[in-house]
């Protein structure tokens, strides 16, 4: 018994001396004493069996069995009640908005992410913020203070000097070989000290190739006749391996005394700490195979490693050979990281890291993770595919800024060829015409809601058609429905029913006669489907007659307007919903829609045909509100699509790497819909396509990040002026045709509000969760009010301000802003 105590005392003295020698001079660890417990709690203070006793086993001591076998009949932990659906939704929503109870644990991670992004976009940070940025993530002090919270009864303590990997994870080879931070609150981590001394085992992380780069290499290999796997794996063949080389599993040579001290700390506590910043990447075993065994390897710091630590013969029984193939694993999980400080703008400006960067900062830059830009790649792919399909289907309109005039001899209503002109607006984006864009789903107010001016235009056309008649040529060459003034009195006969010459309303009643008509090739007396009889008598108004689908089977009817050959039928021309009875040749030349089945313009709905897409539920009431977000995926041409792709691969991808695809996708879509909604109100007769409002909403996210990081930047006014100059330049570009500045303005306003609500982590650290909740609530309420006001202006109280079109197209020349065939005031 005495010998045992002596041995224990000797071992503990040796252990304490070794720990004192390894302790840095300026390190002090204060362990609060446990509080006095009540007598009833003494039973709970007795040693209990741990969950995993194998992890608590000491290397040098034998485990006592009898004590744990006595407690084998203890009760298992009871089942915990599963949270309800409402609680799960409430907790998930709070975590998504960043106002949950564990926000303080995530605040530091997102604070560092915001600092990195601000340093890339807006310039150098302040000196204090730059020092916080260069510290490891566990050492960054909080803006709210670094004082320790009140200690609990039994705080968890992890030995900061136990650095041996084999003693932290004795049974696993692939666990991270970086020291875990202490769990004592208020004590900074010693990783900065241990990383300098054990820096020879941390090689710099290799840069991984992206999928696009590997695809280009594979295509080049196929052209050269080589194997695809050889081309894609040529770079990775030398240094790629998914686990560390066995000779570098231990960072230091630790003796039994260190083992004795470190065995008191459980494996569960040490493995539960997050080690995402200090975890080093695995070293490649194939990298060390290239080094001859006769020469001692040299670490990156210049320290020669002994051969006894390096060259260990592999054991056949413990060698791991059942891993996933290297090429498959790296193809599935590798991604090209966004290097902070060297973003897209940094590459354009030939920016690089300084050579005097410390190893700690370099490891942080290499290990910092970012989101995958899924939404950016998906959106870019959809934009490119849709643009190519549209151009292949509808062709390219004349390129330029003015109006293009086409002249051709076309057969007209009178049976002679006439010289007619077709005028259309040129498209400098190298894409289809405005009529085709409207048919594809462009933002166009007459297709979204009932327009008063277009409705009045249709009513005027129907009034003229109500007084029309059938003009029959005297030489029996044909007939056409027209006005009396357009029918020649010498060469043709104008058939128009009067009070005495009209047919009776009903075949059985000869009293009341018709006064509206006649109509070429349509008569209630000869039409069998739908028949005019009984309760279904056609009204005495030709603008309300249905389309006759079946005529009486007879060669001659005895009526002059029925026995002639009809020359003209309704044709929907331009984008105003106007209709004209004309020949097929003239209709095709004017890029209209010819209706072979109808005889009157009142029998067709031109606006439904011009708008395309899904037909209206009520042909008289347009209801294609889905154009507000469908137009976000369309472009006016190839150049327009290229501009969007460049913006998305720079600004959008950078923001998505910072905040994630779900937040950026919400801001992109909602700001684009809001911009198109405002454009549909103030510019109702302009066909606009493209994500203009969405792009300015993303620019507003940069302003929000700048405002939230104003106190962190060294020169915030310079960053603000740079962003303002970019927005002003884009606004000036919006004065050109086919670019919608109204969508830019309202997209920017909506993006500004949505960024405050859906980007909660890009904030300065002094705001608490209650203040953040108020900010989110106010931003969402203001956005909802703005969106509701725009909806009311569009559907309930439509407005039409012609002067506002100068904000979206300034007339630099007399014909620079011609009306695109879509006048603000219809005549």
Curated annotation (Swiss-Prot):
GO terms for biological process: negative regulation of protein secretion; protein transport; regulation of epidermal growth factor receptor signaling pathway; regulation of protein secretion. One of its GO terms (molecular function) is growth factor binding. It comes from the Eukaryota. Detected in retina and spleen. Residues 64-77 have a biased composition (Basic and acidic residues). Residues 1-380, 653-663, 708-718, 766-773 are cytoplasmic. It is a multi-pass membrane protein. Keywords: Cell membrane, Endoplasmic reticulum, Growth factor binding, Membrane, Phosphoprotein, Protein transport, Transmembrane, Transmembrane helix, Transport. It is found in: Endoplasmic reticulum membrane; Cell membrane. Residues 402-631, 685-686, 740-744, 795-827 are lumenal. The keyword Endoplasmic reticulum applies. Gene3D superfamilies: Rhomboid-like. The chain crosses the membrane at residues 381-401, 632-652, 664-684, 687-707, 719-739, 745-765, 774-794. The modification Phosphoserine is found at residues 60, 84, 88, 294, 296, 299. Interacts with EGF. Interacts (via cytoplasmic N-terminus) with FRMD8/iTAP; this interaction leads to mutual protein stabilization. Interacts with ADAM17/TACE. Regulates ADAM17 protease, a sheddase of the epidermal growth factor (EGF) receptor ligands and TNF, thereby plays a role in sleep, cell survival, proliferation, migration and inflammation. Does not exhibit any protease activity on its own. Belongs to the peptidase S54 family. This is Inactive rhomboid protein 2.
């Amino acid at each position: 018994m005495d010998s045992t105590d002596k041995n224990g005392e000797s071992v503990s003295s040796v252990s304490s001396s070794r720990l004192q020698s390894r302790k840095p001079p300026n390190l002090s660890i204060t362990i609060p004493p446990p509080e006095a417990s009540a007598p009833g709690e003494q039973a709970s203070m007795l040693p209990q069996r741990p969950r995993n006793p194998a992890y608590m086993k000491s290397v040098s001591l034998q485990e006592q069995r009898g004590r744990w076998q006595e407690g084998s009949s203890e009760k298992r932990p009871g089942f915990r009640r599963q949270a309800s659906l409402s609680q799960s939704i409430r907790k998930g929503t709070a975590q998504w908005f960043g106002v949950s109870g564990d926000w303080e644990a995530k605040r530091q991670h997102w604070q560092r992410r915001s600092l990195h992004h601000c340093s890339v976009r807006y310039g150098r940070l302040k000196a204090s913020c730059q020092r916080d940025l260069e510290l490891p993530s566990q050492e960054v002090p909080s803006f709210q203070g670094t004082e320790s919270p009140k200690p609990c009864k039994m705080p968890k303590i992890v030995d900061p000097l136990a650095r041996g990997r084999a003693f932290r994870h004795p049974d696993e080879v692939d666990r991270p070989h970086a020291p875990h931070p202490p769990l004592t609150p208020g004590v900074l981590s010693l990783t900065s000290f241990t990383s300098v001394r054990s820096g020879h085992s941390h090689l710099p992380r290799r840069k991984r190739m992206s999928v696009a780069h590997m695809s280009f290499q594979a295509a080049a290999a196929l052209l050269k006749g080589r194997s695809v796997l050889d081309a894609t794996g040529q770079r990775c063949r030398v240094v790629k391996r998914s686990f560390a080389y066995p000779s570098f599993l231990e960072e230091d040579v630790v003796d039994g005394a260190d083992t004795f001290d470190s065995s008191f700390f459980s494996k569960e506590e040490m493995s539960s700490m997050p080690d995402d910043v200090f975890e080093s990447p695995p070293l490649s075993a194939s990298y060390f195979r290239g080094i001859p065994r006769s020469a001692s390897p040299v670490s990156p710091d210049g320290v020669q490693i002994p051969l006894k630590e390096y060259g260990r013969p592999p054991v056949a029984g413990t060698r791991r050979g059942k891993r996933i193939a290297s090429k498959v694993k790296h193809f599935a999980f590798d991604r090209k990281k966004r290097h902070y400080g060297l973003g897209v703008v940094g590459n354009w400006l030939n920016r690089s890291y300084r050579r005097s960067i410390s190893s700690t900062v370099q490891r942080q830059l290499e290990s910092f993770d970012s989101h995958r830009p899924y939404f950016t790649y998906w959106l870019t792919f959809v934009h490119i595919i849709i643009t190519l399909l549209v151009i292949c289907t509808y062709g390219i309109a004349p390129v330029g800024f003015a109006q293009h005039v086409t002249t051709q001899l076309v057969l007209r209503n009178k049976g002679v060829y006439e010289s007619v002109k077709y005028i259309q607006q040129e498209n400098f984006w190298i894409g289809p015409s405005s009529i085709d864009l409207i048919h594809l789903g462009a933002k166009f107010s007459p297709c979204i809601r009932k327009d008063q001016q277009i409705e009045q235009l249709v009513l005027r056309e129907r009034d003229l058609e109500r007084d029309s008649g059938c003009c029959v040529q005297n030489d029996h060459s044909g007939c056409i429905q027209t006005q009396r003034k357009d029918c020649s009195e010498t060469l043709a006969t104008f058939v128009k029913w009067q009070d005495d010459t009209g047919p009776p309303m009903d075949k059985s009643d000869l009293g009341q006669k018709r006064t509206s008509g006649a109509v070429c090739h349509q008569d209630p007396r000869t039409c069998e489907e739908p028949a005019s009889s009984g309760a279904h008598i056609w009204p005495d108004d030709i603008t309300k007659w249905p389309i006759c689908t079946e005529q009486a089977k007879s060669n001659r009817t005895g009526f002059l307007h029925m026995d002639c050959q009809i020359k003209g039928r309704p044709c929907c021309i331009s984008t105003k919903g106007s209709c004209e009875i004309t020949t097929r040749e003239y209709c095709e030349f004017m890029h209209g829609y010819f209706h072979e089945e109808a005889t009157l313009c009142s029998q067709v709905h031109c606006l439904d045909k011009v708008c395309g897409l899904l037909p209206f539920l009520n042909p008289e009431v347009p209801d294609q509100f889905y154009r507000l977000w469908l137009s976000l995926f369309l472009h006016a041409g190839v150049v327009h699509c290229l501009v969007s792709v460049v913006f998305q691969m720079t600004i959008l991808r950078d923001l998505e790497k910072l905040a994630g695809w779900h937040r950026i996708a919400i801001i992109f879509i909602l700001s684009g819909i809001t911009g198109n909604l405002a454009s549909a109100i103030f510019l109702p007769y302009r066909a606009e396509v493209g994500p203009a409002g969405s792009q300015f909403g993303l620019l507003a996210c940069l302003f929000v990040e700048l405002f939230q990081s104003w106190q962190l930047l060294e020169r915030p006014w310079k960053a603000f002026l740079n962003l303002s100059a970019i927005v002003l330049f884009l606004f000036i570009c919006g004065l050109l045709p086919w670019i919608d500045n109204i969508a830019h303005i309202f997209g920017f306003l909506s993006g500004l509000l949505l960024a405050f609500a859906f980007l909660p982590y890009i904030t300065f650290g002094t705001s608490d969760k209650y203040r953040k909740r108020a900010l989110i609530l106010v931003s969402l309420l203001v956005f909802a009010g703005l969106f509701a006001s725009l909806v009311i202006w569009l559907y309930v109280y439509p407005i039409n301000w012609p002067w506002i079109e100068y904000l979206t197209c300034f007339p630099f020349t007399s014909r620079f802003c011609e009306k695109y065939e879509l006048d603000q005031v219809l005549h």
